[in-house]
Amino acid sequence: KATSWSIQELFGVNYDDPMWDELVSQLSLDQAADLITRAGFGTMAIDSIAKPKTVDADGPSGFNNNVTGTNNLKAVNYPSDTVIAQTWDWYIAYQVGCAIGIEGNALRIDGWYGPGANLHRSALGGRNFEYYSEDGLLAGTICAYHVLGAKEKGVLAYIKHIGANEDDKGRTEGTGAFKWLTEQSFRENYLKPFEMAIKVGGANGLM
């Protein structure tokens, strides 16, 4: 008879450990599908693995679903990622991340759809305000400590929008402007901030 696990019992267990396969086998096919396909802004509770419901909120400069008034909670709008990167100070990024994490705890938010780690490829980029810099190393350093601060307070960061995503019009329909770049450029520049956010900051998710 297979051992039954709760998701809390596997906290900190290596991703490659076979116990994860045993945990997943406790889900029905519908539960497994729903966990992926119905995961916008949170995930449902699953009793068979004692998984609680989670709540995620959007906004690289704070939880904007509160700022824009979709509920009655109050929230802080922090300086944009670009402004934070212009300080060239990883500790400021870390402090902002901590503040976002503390606020997330107060609002009972588990995950943060941010920060944004794409590069400023063009001054006309539709989401430049969400991203740090045109330099991959600077963006990666600031992003990593932004993420680390939030994570240390218990809020998981979902870094976005991977990768080379700087055209807003038609971006989800496949009708936007195409980008041309070499694999070397993609790896050394555009993916560098995401790599650093994971390796240095401990980011748990990508968008």
Please give the residue ranges for each predicted region.
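Glycoside hydrolase catalytic-domain context in secreted enzymes
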Residues: 1-207
